[in-house]
Structure formats: structure tokens, C-alpha cells
Amino acid sequence: MAPESDLVLLGEVMRIKGNAVDLVPEQILLGEFWLDSIRVWMQTRDYCRPPVDDFPVGSRWIMALAEITEVPEDGFDPSTPNQSYGRPFDFVLSSCGGYWLRVNGATAVGNLVPGMPRFYHQPDMSPVLIDLIAGYLDGAVPETALVEASRERPDVVDELILDTRSFLRGQEDWLPDTSPEDLEAP
């Protein structure tokens, strides 16, 4: 992730249009953005950007984006308006490094920590809490904590998680049908 990016946000893909995706921002992690949606331009020609097909509608991502301030002279072709460099004040997502993380619930995975090869976009790692990433971008969490949180879990831990899930499967029949609010204080 790039703390020097113009905008870092958590958002959900709501639409794909040509080589761009429209995101609904859920949380701004770095920078400022005030609109209800944001257009992010992806791969076309030989620009160092990921393909739009990697970001399906409904998927959630943390993206470190660069704002388009100027469109190059050959950046727009009227015969293919949905395949272009992008428009001024929209954003681009680079694939030349770790600029996006896949989000699942309250965690994210991807090319997160410094030192990972720049084109290694799906590393073996543990999911990292979004709040930890936000704390890192705010300067409240050190890089070492982020690196430690992302370390791949040992196989023993994965086995323990699977054993626990297996043990708990079917246990709902043994639990009372009351919520904590229904219980009386002693």
C-alpha cells in the first residue's frame, strides 16, 4: 500500500463500464473524497494497471489511488469512449506494486507489506484487520505490527481453527433460545 497515494479507500464495486469500475466508498482511509461514487480506470493499452475483470461487481477492496490531473494527448479515442486513459479528477489504480487489497468482512489480504515483490498480488498471508491498516495509514500503528499481523499462520493454527469449527458445527441445538437481554440479573 502506498501512504503517498492521493486517496486510499475501502469501497464496493457497483458497476463496470469499459475499462473502469465505479466504487461506492465505505471508508476513506487516507485523503479526502466527498461524492457518493468514484470512477477508477483500469488497464487499457500498455498502461501499468490491472484488468477490470479482476474486480467483479459486488466485490470489496481497499485501493490506493492516484488522481488523474491531466489526460495525455492520445488518452481518449472517440471511437472507443469506454476504453480510455480516464477523465480528469477520476482516479487510476496502478498494478506496478501493491495498490489494492481484497476485503472480506473486516479483514483484507493482498500485497500489503513492504518488501513483497511488486507484481505479487495474492501472497500467502493471514488476513489483516481493516482497523489495523487504517491505524497504520494514520501513523498510530507501526509498520512492524502490520508485518507481524500479515504473517502466514502456521499449519498448526489452521488445524486448530478447522477442529474448532468442526466441533462447534451442530452445537446450536444445545444452546438456550434466549438472548442476553432476556436473562435476569442475579
Show which residues each predicted segment covers:
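N-terminal post-signal-peptidase region of extra-cytosolic proteins
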Residues: 1, 39-51
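Structural detector for short beta-strands of small beta-barrel domains
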Residues: 4-28
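Hydrophobic beta-strand residues in large extracellular and virion-surface proteins
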Residues: 13, 23, 40, 62-63
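Netrin-like (NTR/C345C) domain of secreted extracellular proteins
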Residues: 48-186
